[in-house]
C-alpha cells in the first residue's frame, strides 16, 4: 500500500512539475546582464556559480543537465537576453561566449590606449605597451589601427602584439616592394607620419603636409608642429599651448626648439599617413595654417604665412 502511495506521489509530482520545467526551458530571459563562468571550475562549481547569478534554480539546472547528458560548462561570458534557458545552457556547454571588440584608432597615443584597455573587458597586462616585443627603440605609434575582437578576460598583450606584428609586416612589405622617395628610414617615416596624422584635417591634405615637413627637413628648418609640443606635455596637457610651452627647451618633443624629428612617434599613424610620408617628396610649401577644422592654407614664404594668420584672426607666436 505504501509503495503504491509513493509511486502515485512521484507520478503526480512529475505531472505537476514537468509543465513548469518545460515553461522555464523555453521562456526567453529578459535579463540584460550576461552570465560569467570563471576558468577552471568543476561542473558542480559552475552550476553553483550560475545559480548564484540568479539565472536558474540549481535543482532544475541539474535536472536539465542530467536529461540532456551535459557534463561540462566552458568558461567565459554568455549572453542570455532574449534566449530560452535551453539555448543558454547549450551555449555554455559548447563555449559560445560573447565576442567583444576594441577599436585601435589612428591618432591614438599610449595614454589614450591605456585608458581604452582599462575601460574594456581585457586584462591589462601590458601597461603603456611595456610588453611588446619590437625592433623599434620606442613604444609609441607601433600599432596597426584596426578593430580587434576578443573574449572577456583575454590578455591585452595578445591583441597588442598582434597589432604591432601587423604594422611591422606592412612596413617590411612597403620597404621591400618599392623605394621611398626620400632619405628617411622606417623609424623616421613612422615618426613623421604620426605628426602628419595629428596635423592633417583630411586625407587629401596628407601629401601636402608631408611635403611641407620634408621640405623643412631638407632645408634644416625646424618642423614647428604644435602636436609635438602637446605630446611632450602629456599626460598633463591642459588643452592650451602657451608661449612658455613653445619656448620650453626641456620638452624633447618640442619641434619649435629641437632640430629634426622628435625621438619617437606621437601617435598611431593611419596607413594613408604612412604612405604620404613614404612616397612623399619635399614640396614647394614651407608653412601651413588651419583655415577650418578640416583644411589648411599652405604658404611658400613666411610673409605670406603671417598674412594668412592675420587674415584668419589667429594668435600665433612669431618665432
Regions found by a protein language model. Name each.
Residues 1-224, 228-234, 248, 265-272, ...:
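Conserved catalytic or metal-liganding residues and their short signature motifs at active sites
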Residues 238-269, 274:
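Binding-cleft/active-site segments that stabilize strongly anionic ligands or cofactors
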Amino acid at each position: 500500500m505504501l509503495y503504491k502511495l509513493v509511486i502515485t506521489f512521484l507520478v503526480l509530482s512529475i505531472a505537476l512539475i514537468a509543465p513548469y520545467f518545460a515553461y522555464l526551458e523555453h521562456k526567453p530571459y529578459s535579463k540584460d546582464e550576461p552570465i560569467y563562468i570563471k576558468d577552471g571550475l568543476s561542473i558542480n562549481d559552475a552550476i553553483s556559480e550560475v545559480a548564484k547569478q540568479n539565472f536558474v534554480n540549481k535543482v532544475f539546472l541539474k535536472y536539465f543537465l542530467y536529461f540532456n547528458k551535459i557534463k561540462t560548462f566552458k568558461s567565459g561570458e554568455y549572453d542570455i537576453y532574449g534566449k530560452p534557458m535551453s539555448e543558454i545552457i547549450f551555449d555554455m556547454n559548447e563555449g559560445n561566449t560573447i565576442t567583444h571588440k576594441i577599436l585601435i584608432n589612428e591618432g591614438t597615443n599610449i595614454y589614450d590606449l591605456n585608458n581604452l584597455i582599462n575601460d574594456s573587458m581585457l586584462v591589462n597586462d601590458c601597461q603603456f605597451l611595456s610588453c611588446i616585443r619590437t625592433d623599434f627603440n620606442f613604444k609609441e605609434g607601433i600599432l596597426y589601427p584596426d578593430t580587434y575582437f576578443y573574449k572577456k578576460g583575454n590578455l591585452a598583450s595578445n591583441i597588442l602584439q598582434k597589432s604591432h606584428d601587423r604594422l611591422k609586416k606592412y612596413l617590411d612589405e612597403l620597404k621591400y616592394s618599392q623605394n621611398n622617395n626620400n632619405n628617411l628610414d622606417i623609424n623616421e617615416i613612422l615618426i613623421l607620419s604620426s605628426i602628419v596624422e595629428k596635423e592633417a584635417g583630411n586625407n587629401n591634405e596628407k601629401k601636402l603636409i608631408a611635403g611641407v615637413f620634408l621640405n623643412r627637413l631638407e632645408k634644416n628648418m625646424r618642423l614647428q608642429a604644435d602636436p609635438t609640443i602637446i605630446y611632450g606635455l602629456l599626460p598633463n596637457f591642459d588643452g592650451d599651448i602657451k608661449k612658455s610651452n613653445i619656448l620650453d627647451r626641456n620638452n624633447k618633443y618640442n619641434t619649435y626648439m629641437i632640430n629634426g624629428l622628435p625621438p619617437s612617434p606621437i601617435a598611431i599613424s593611419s596607413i594613408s599617413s604612412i604612405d604620404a610620408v613614404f612616397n612623399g617628396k619635399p614640396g614647394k610649401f614651407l608653412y601651413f595654417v588651419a583655415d577650418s577644422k578640416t583644411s589648411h592654407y599652405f604658404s611658400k614664404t613666411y610673409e605670406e604665412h603671417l598674412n594668412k594668420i592675420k587674415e584668419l584672426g589667429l594668435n600665433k607666436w612669431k618665432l
